[in-house]
UniProtKB/Swiss-Prot annotation:
Keyword Transcription regulation annotated: yes
Cross-referenced PROSITE patterns: CSD_1, CSD_2
GO MF assignments: DNA binding
Gene Ontology cellular-component terms listed: cytosol
Listed SUPFAM superfamilies: Nucleic acid-binding proteins
SMART domains assigned to the protein according to its UniProt record, in alphabetical order: CSP
Segments forming a coiled coil: none
Protein name: Cold shock-like protein CspA
Pfam families: CSD (PF00313)
Keywords, alphabetical: Activator, Cytoplasm, DNA-binding, Transcription, Transcription regulation
Cellular localization per UniProt: Cytoplasm
InterPro entries: Cold_shock_CspA, Cold_shock_domain, CSD, CSD_CS, CSP_DNA-bd, NA-bd_OB-fold
């Protein structure tokens, strides 16, 4: 799918291990799982944090992968 998308963390719950990223381009909010956070070498995400990510589709839903801090 799409690569190098810029966005901002809308919210992330480290207890539930997921959250959502708001795309700067106005697209739909994107689900982000703890596995993407871990793969980026991060412990958690903070609300309002600027990120860059790629979109991957699984089972008809878009997920943030290859997460990087902007």
């Amino acid at each position: 799918m799409a690569t190098n998308i810029v966005g901002k963390v809308k919210w992330y719950n480290s207890t539930k291990n997921f959250g959502f990223i708001e795309q700067d381009n106005g697209g739909k909010d994107v689900f982000v799982h703890k596995s993407a956070v871990d793969a980026a070498g991060l412990h958690s995400l903070e609300e309002g944090q600027d990120v860059i990510f790629d979109l991957e589709e699984k089972q008809g839903k878009a997920y943030a992968v290859n997460l990087r801090i902007k």
